[in-house]
Amino acid sequence: MRESIVERRTSETDIVLKIGLDRTEPHQITISTGIPFFDHMVQAMSRHGGFDLNITAKGDLEVDSHHTIEDIGIVLGTALQQALGDGRGIKRFGYAIIPMDEALAEAVLDCGGRGYLVFKGTFGNSTVGGIDTSLFEHFFYSLCIHAGITAHIRFSGQNDHHTAEAIFKAFGIALGQAVTIIPESNQIPSTKGTL
């Protein structure tokens, strides 16, 4: 089983995260960050990506949600990197284009060990669900850098809830594809022989 448990404790946050990349039925998803809209987004990402995810996070929400969301990205990225190991047998690449009513999001991923993020699109408002919309890019940046994932995310929409949800679902589906094991493959998906 490709699983990882990562804990992060700082003066700003206390996070325990467990991820399982190999599909189980029913999915084991429990997200508790103290930020209900963010919980909803991460749950959608996990469910549509087909991986188990349990997050318990306590952060300095009396300040704002920045530290909590950033640190969850760091911990999730670290857990993904650990669960993938050397990447032997994975598809490595994944993509998804997901609509949600008027919103459309595209996510293209390479789990090749090089952390990078391109995040293109604009939200109509500065906040959605009580979250500063700039934190979505920051979350995915933190995740990608610590997981060693290159991600290109593009989006458009008029309703920011729909737009955010389409982004998280697209990322989850693309990630689920990229980490899928190719049957009977024991190869590291790189011409270099390493990710």
From Swiss-Prot:
According to its UniProt record, which protein family does this protein belong to?
Belongs to the imidazoleglycerol-phosphate dehydratase family.
Q: What keywords is this UniProt entry annotated with? A: Amino-acid biosynthesis, Cytoplasm, Histidine biosynthesis, Lyase
HAMAP family for the chain: HisB
Cross-referenced Gene3D superfamilies: Imidazole glycerol phosphate dehydratase, domain 1 (3.30.230.40)
Protein EC: 4.2.1.19
Q: List the InterPro entries.
A: IGPD_sf, ImidazoleglycerolP_deHydtase, ImidazoleglycerP_deHydtase_CS, Ribosomal_Su5_D2-typ_SF
Q: What is this protein called?
A: Imidazoleglycerol-phosphate dehydratase
Q: Which domain of life is it from?
A: Archaea
PANTHER family given in the database record: IMIDAZOLEGLYCEROL-PHOSPHATE DEHYDRATASE, IMIDAZOLEGLYCEROL-PHOSPHATE DEHYDRATASE HIS7
Q: Which reactions are catalysed by this chain? A: D-erythro-1-(imidazol-4-yl)glycerol 3-phosphate = 3-(imidazol-4-yl)-2-oxopropyl phosphate + H2O
